[in-house]
Amino acid sequence: MLLNQNTNDNYTARQLKLPLEIEKLIDISDPVYTFCEVMDHIDLSRYCSLREIEKLCRNDIRYMYLLDEMKAPTFATFGNLIRNELTDSIEQIFMDINAYIFSKDHVDLQHTYIDGTKIEANANRYTWVWKKSCIKNRQKIFDKISLLIDAMNQEVLGYLGLKLEKREEYAINYISELLEMYKRGTGLDENLFVSGCGHRKSIQQKQYQELQGYLKRLKTYARHIEICGDERNSYSKTDQDATFMRLKRDYMGNDQLLPAYNLQTAICDEYIAVIDVKPYASDMECFVPLVEKFNRSYGHYPKYPVADAGYGSYNNYLYCEEHGMEKYMKFTMYKKETTDKKYRENPYRAVNFTKDADGNLICPNGQKFLFKRTQPVKYNKYGRTEELYECESCEGCPHKQECCPRAHKNRTIRMNQELTAIHQEVLNNLTSIHGALLRMNRSIQSEGTFGVLKWDKSYKRLFRRGEKNVILELTLISCGFNLYKYHNKKQRQMKQCHLAVSYTHLTLPTIRL
């Protein structure tokens, strides 16, 4: 029985391209293959514009390979995908990518390098609203309302047997009630109000409209203060979640504050493990939320959280003690303590004072410092207190100019023995061999991460507005950063293996038979 044999070659007479598979045109070491190994669609390049991505899908063969030769999506399709599908799921996608990479690369999650940077928001530059200015102007409105109520009672309501009550501060609802009482007491009809040239307003209409204007301004100030909240003192009108901060790169040249977000990252073995976005200009208040997010993501706290002096506070140190973390965050005067010998050994510093048998501090002149009282420290979570000590007598002291030249009375010092002991523990940790290696790695990994993002990828300004969209954008950036880092590590390992094999072949002895 004869079998039908297929003798057709893999081509058509109208074929217009060779080869048939686009992937044969792409270098085997191209990052696009790593993309497909981890997930189906991802972008590791520095393209953030959706229109630019659409253009690449039409012209770049690497993007065509990802699309499997399907029709290139429009920029609106990309935008809808990000806005509707990724906004709520991007955190889980980021964790899934990290879980894959960390298991393949055996990432150490016990050593975490923490740092923050300020990224300029996508907001107009001169759209600031200052909370303190709103509070000050609101108080001025309160004073004007009191004067207006006096005029109302004296000029109009006094003849009608009515009187409006004055207060130190006026709520919006109370001003609305005053307007209604004044309108009802005087029989005003807003439909009969006059305006424009040739019309003279009555005194009742003038007072009523003036109070209406104050009410409108109070509502505006109340809204501004509510948007600022308790955690910040400013916001931008075009991006209400952005806070005005002082950036290192002052391209405007006038030392002006710019709307920005504080990006916090936790780096493990050069990968971004956790990111967080906060409206605080200082890093000190960002440590606990970032570490808590790390715990929620990986189920444990890092054993060695390493950070710069911006994170070293009493609250953060005690937080580390509570959760079994070692103290490897520098404190404010760490650099001066370790590099300035004159400052470190200054005999007039309270920490260098000697103590007598009773535990009293003794100054270089031999005078005792007696305990006066204990006072609490403001804005402290753990109830931190300070001990206040005063010298017995500074009169006729030969060390007056070196010890306290500006003091007119006996010198007083404030100390916290617990905080002093914590600083000494931090010094011992960071000056050890292990601590020196951690400090070096923090500078390389955390600072290097921001260097790659800001300078190598030219990512210095956000593209989206609103905290939720900013977190989405930065998480997408972190996904691309980790995948690109993983790809580069794989390529280096493959190259090292290839060189090792080549070297082995070159050095094998020749065996003669």
Q: Whereabouts are the PLM-identified features?
A:
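Basic, low-complexity segments
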Residues: 2-44
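Cysteine-cluster motifs in flexible loop/terminal segments that predominantly coordinate metals
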Residues: 360-414
